[in-house]
Amino acid sequence: MLKQQTIDTIKATVPALQAHGLTITKTFYTNLFNENPSLLNIFNQTNQTKGRQQGALANTVLAAAMHIDNLEAIVPVVVKIAHKHRSLGVLPEHYEIVGANLLKAIKEVLGDAATDEIIEAWGEAYGVIADIFISVEEDLYKASEAAGGWRLFKQFKIVRKVAESDLITSIYMAPVDGEPLPIATAGQYVTVRATVPGKEYLMNRQYTITQS
């Protein structure tokens, strides 16, 4: 539970986030990857290049600030993001790294306007929000392990490719260990993580499951 003073301080930063949120998140990602290049194995590099990830994070941070006194209001957003995090293998230990770099970016962009009180308040708020994400994601990880499922990634092999049209190709895959797979439900997708020739880091792409 956040103190009222912390809530008031966070809400007071909303105008600054509205004005500088995108700059903060761009700075955040630059610092994050410079200091932790291994995280490039997790994040979608195409979304980074096109600025989608920076914009999405800026909107999320702003929403958290605006609803810091009623975080239940952002639970639907948290759940949506948590599903994506689970699909990419985001772990609890990543949140400490992200938090440190987010606070650093806020200070770097806002300068003297980011007082010690503001940085401390955002540190406390981030801790609460991170705990919510970690809890939701752990539930998702546990659910993914049920009925033939697995946590994180599993090796598959391509057994068949079918060109359905000029734009669509169906890829049929089977687990390397030969174990049976859980039955997929409508709307589910799978993250394919693979090495790509000429690329230094792993590439992640989400694909819709059409048959299980």
Segments predicted by a language model, with ranges:
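Globin-like tetrapyrrole-binding proteins
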Residues: 1-153
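Ferredoxin-reductase
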Residues: 147-212
